[in-house]
Amino acid sequence: MTPPMHTRVRNYFADASLTDGFNTQLLVWNDTGNLSDKFMVFRPNGGSSIRDELGAEYYVMVDVIGAKGNNGAVDERVQQIISTIQNNPISDSCLGYIENFGGIPAPVLTTEGRLVYRLQFAIKYGE
């Protein structure tokens, strides 16, 4: 079975060392309770119709969640993610073409004071 697209995006990020130092999770964020932990959560976010033998566009949301009091590090990683994808949009045959859409949104804070960016990506893939 082919992994779902959000899992393939997670693998692409890991191969590019973009998840280093972060706990990666799929679908939902499960906080460990340790305020020094950082997270990346990969989840599907819609897309175009998926048909056999035709390409489709998949949307994936990536939540980048920082450690409490370490806003600069999470902001720097978000910039690194965007730069890596801009420079390597077709580097993984399991993805096809990936691009950021929506830019970098304003971050929000969790109740605990963690900075959260919600990045969106469009992946154009067909076999």
PLM features per residue range, with description:
Residues 1-23, 41-127:
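Charged, amphipathic alpha-helical segments and their flanking helix caps
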Residues 25-34:
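Short acidic low-complexity segments
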Residues 37-39:
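N-terminal, polar/charged subdomain of small-to-medium soluble alpha/beta proteins
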